[in-house]
Structure formats: C-alpha cells, structure tokens
UniProtKB/Swiss-Prot annotation:
Protein species of origin: Cyberlindnera jadinii (strain ATCC 18201 / CBS 1600 / BCRC 20928 / JCM 3617 / NBRC 0987 / NRRL Y-1542) (Torula yeast)
Designated gene of the protein: EAT2
The organism's taxonomic lineage, starting at the top: Eukaryota, Fungi, Dikarya, Ascomycota, Saccharomycotina
InterPro entries according to UniProt: AB_hydrolase_1, AB_hydrolase_fold
Keywords, sorted A to Z: Hydrolase, Transferase
Cysteines engaged in disulfide bonds, as pairs: none
Gene Ontology MF: a single term: transferase activity
EC numbers for this chain: 2.3.1.-
Pfam families: Abhydrolase_1
Top EC group: transferase
Membrane-traversing stretches: none
Biological role: Probable alcohol acetyltransferase that uses acetyl-CoA to synthesize acetate esters from various alcohols. Not involved in the synthesis of ethyl acetate.
Active site residues per record: S124, H293
Name used for this protein in its record: Probable alcohol acetyltransferase
Family assignment from sequence similarity: Belongs to the AB hydrolase superfamily.
Amino acid sequence: MQITKQLWSKAVTKAPLLPLPTKTKVSLAYKLHMPNKTVTPNLTIRSHEPIVFLHGVFGSKKNYGDICQTIANTTHTPVYAIDFRNHGESEHCFPLVNYSQLSKDVVDFCEEHDLKRVSIVGYSLGAKVGLLTMLKHPKLVNSGVIIGNAPIETPQVKVYLKVFLKAMTALIDSAHIKATDKNWREKARAVMSKYIPDASIVQYLLRNVLNKKSSHIPGHTDLISVQMPISHFNKDVIDDISDWPAEEVKGLKFEGPVKVVKGLKSAFITKEGEKAYAEHFPNYTMSTFNTNHLIFAEMPSRVTKTVCDFIKLTRYQLLQQHTRDGKHHTIQKVDPALLNSSEASTVEQATKQL
C-alpha cells in the first residue's frame, strides 16, 4: 500500500468544535440482513446463533452491505452489521476509539437485541474488537472470522491513519466544497487523492463524506461534511487504534473455532501476531490471500466464500460434537441445504438422535 507521508500536527483541524459527551453505553446503529426468501423459500430452521459483523476504522455498515447480505443468504443466518460509536450513524461521544469500550459496546448490543452464541466476523479495527470480545466473553461467542489484524500492538498502522485523517480534514479546512455542487463527490475525491494515491482507499474513505451540514463543526451549513467526528481525532486516538490491551487479556484463551484471514502483502499480521494467536486462540486456523490490507476490496467473492464456508463447517462440526456429548438443549440445528450431500446425510442422521 503506497501512500504519501505527511507531517502530523497536534491540531487535527482548524475548525471550532462542538463538545462531545462522555458515555459508557450507547445504542449502536445497525442494519439487519435477513436471508433472502427467494434464496431459501422453504427455510424452516431459523438460526439462533446470529452473525455480528464488525467493520474497519473509518468504515461503517454501508461499506459491507452486499457482503453481509451474501453471508446471510449463503449461511441462512441473520447478519447484524453494526456501526461502532463515532462511525457511520452511531452516536458521537467519548471515548472515541478504545478497544475495551468498543468491545463493551458490542456486548451491550448483543444483550439489547437478545443475541446469544453469536459468530463474529471482524475486519481490521473490528477484528481486534472481535478478538477482545471473544477473550473476555467466551460464553457469548460461538466462533469468529478475523480478517486483517492480530491481537498485538500494530504501530505500523499509524502512518496510514495519519494520512487518512489528513486527507479527510483537508475537506473540512480548505476544500470549501459546496454541498449543493452537483460534482461534490468527484471534487472530494480529487482532494483526497492528493494525499492518498490508492483509488480503492479513497473510495473506502469517501463513504464518510456527506453533502449535508456537519454534526460536530458549527458554521459548516452549506459545505460537504465528514460523517465521523474526525475533528476530535488526535494523536492519542491514533495510538489507541494501534494499541492492544495485552494486560487485560493476559492468560485468557478462547477455545472456540477461529478463522484468521491474512493478506500476504499486508504487514498487519506478523510472526509475532501469529504467535499471539496461538497463545490466546488454540483452535485458530489461517487462510491467506495475495492481497494488501483491503482484502474485501481486492478479493470480495473469495473472502466472503471463506467466511461462509467456515461458519457452515463450524456449525456442522459443533452439531457432531454436541451429539456425541449427548447435549440436547443448546444445539444449533443445521439446514442440510447448507452442506454437500455427504455432510447433509450425516447431519440428518445426527439430528434424528437429538
């Protein structure tokens, strides 16, 4: 990933700011993706183990709508795509980006919506939040697919985050693009491209740009705005995003199945990261793709298939385990339509024993 390095200033934006409240509990915005009835018209077995999709930094549920719907259709499972605090349509408040708080927000969301034994799919920032949630709340999580990150500090991400913030704050401080300008999006793209030559990253970040009044900067009544409160994002936030609460999870393990997806051209999952996976997630497996960090953007179909295949296979294996153990009350029954003919026959026989 080639980007232009810029000097970092203490003041992220020159614009005056509206104050943000401090909250330990927020109601997260979300999009519920239900399996398409045209895909599964005769589906009678509903999943009691929903999927919670956690997006990356500067992203939102909007970035992954098609992917989440495909996962829902393929796994016959409801997918809850959430917006983290200070992202997408969720509330702006302090703490801005803190892993312990973000994980608590996910747990609160699951409790609010009565979600139990969830499968977590987390990308980048969402990957670390998902990992922390699995370690601290293992009874809540059934399995996880973790994409493009590891349970360690990742200082290498800081240079990218600084440039991304520079590009977006340039839209606020100096671009002066009118919200009524019919070419506002292309003009915003041109401004950001001066800082970030990678078109796929610019496209990703443009999802934050709106042709409406800013919610956190007074006086921006007729200009385009950035949906996130990035004007409050300073060096401390950059440090928080690259951090990992190692002391908080010392000695903790998640024994459930975990699939790690790694981009071979990305520096996010190092040998140290793989060692940390082995320490905390003894039942993890890894799939690699010849991509950079934006794995979903570069190979959306292949990565989505990996997610779906893992979730389906995991449920099949857990059903077998529960059957062998004689456990009947918490079984997630598997629709044979999800599996190949051999697996479906095995599941059918196992289900008769429940």
